[in-house]
UniProtKB/Swiss-Prot annotation:
GO terms for biological process: DNA recombination; regulation of DNA recombination. This is Recombination-associated protein RdgC. GO terms for cellular component: bacterial nucleoid; cytoplasm. It comes from Erwinia tasmaniensis (strain DSM 17950 / CFBP 7177 / CIP 109463 / NCPPB 4357 / Et1/99). HAMAP family: RdgC (MF_00194).
């Protein structure tokens, strides 16, 4: 099971039918195919079960898991530059003149095409969890751009995807700052030992601390001086640890050993059964975590 490491949370802002069988057909039209000799990158859907499955959707209890794979050809800039300079020098010597910029740009395209078949590939995978019960979509990545790119592929596959980032009623950084200032958190949450504080003014500086008692005079002085907590390490129910950011993203998810080992009684050879059990467990825990976190931060903004 690919336990999520990050959560970028989006709200489906109107009801759309997300039927697994129909989705399967829609995603299949955009399934992953490797780069051809002249492709710089390719993205498409793969089975969440990897080599152990063929279906592009994994569905349980109204929860849908899908995975996008991206292949990128790696062409380091110095390699392109060296090949381009050699080609320019050769042509300028042959023609006894300096090449124009437009000619050099055209040559660069030629160089890229000649190098692509020999380029190494880098593969990455981004999983998307669709919670049809709560009308939420979660993307397992740390970058908003990567999340948006993955959702763009999903939108293209489905034809429509009315989602917006989950927004809260109150600024998150104000709530995080108050938690650190007072040392008092809502039930179920506990401060850990890592935070980032930023000055309200752009040139006012950033403080990052690790392995630090956050309820102390030093941190209090920074808050008193006008800095706000923009990232905060938290423990939830002694089951999940995370970094909560002021943009609403949740990063560096760490599930407790008790959680991860809960389904160890399932035969290891039953890959699908274990995957399914872990998916049910993970989505149940994360749905509760998201709900508790939104409530602790003052609730979702009215739409």
């Amino acid at each position: 099971m690919l336990w999520f490491k990050n959560l970028m949370v989006y709200r489906l802002n109107r009801d759309i039918p997300l039927v697994a069988d129909e989705m399967e057909k829609q995603l299949d039209a955009f399934s992953f195919t490797p780069c051809g000799s002249q492709d710089m990158a390719k993205t498409g859907w793969v089975s969440p079960l990897g080599a152990h499955g063929e279906d592009l959707t994994h569905v349980t209890n109204g929860q849908i898991l899908i995975c996008a794979r991206k292949e990128e050809k790696m062409l380091p800039s110095p390699v392109i530059k060296q090949a381009l300079e050699a080609k320019i020098s050769k042509l300028e010597a042959e023609q006894s003149r300096k090449l124009k910029k437009t000619e050099k740009d055209s040559l660069k395209d030629e160089v890229l095409h000649s190098l692509l078949p020999r380029a190494f590939s880098r593969f990455s995978q981004t999983c998307v969890w669709i919670d049809t019960v709560n009308n939420l979509i979660m993307v397992d990545c740390a970058s908003a751009k990567k999340a948006e790119d993955t959702l763009a592929l999903l939108r293209k596959s489905l034809g429509s995807l009315p989602v917006v980032p989950l927004t809260l009623e109150s600024p998150i950084e104000l709530t995080l700052t108050e938690w650190v200032r007072s040392g008092e958190l809502p039930a179920g949450f506990a401060l850990m030992d890592e935070a980032e504080l930023k000055a309200i003014l752009e040139d006012g500086g950033v403080i990052r601390c690790k392995k630090q008692d956050l309820v102390c005079d030093e941190i209090a002085n920074h808050i008193e001086a006008g800095k706000l907590v923009t990232k905060l390490a938290l423990d939830w129910q002694e089951r999940i640890q995370m970094i909560l950011s002021d943009d609403g993203s949740i990063k560096r998810l760490k599930f407790s050993d008790i959680l991860r080992e809960q389904n160890d009684d399932i035969d290891r050879e039953d890959v699908t059964g274990r995957f399914d059990a872990d998916f049910i467990l993970m989505t149940g825990e994360l749905a509760a975590l998201i709900s508790n976190t939104v409530e602790a931060l003052g609730g979702e903004a009215q739409r």
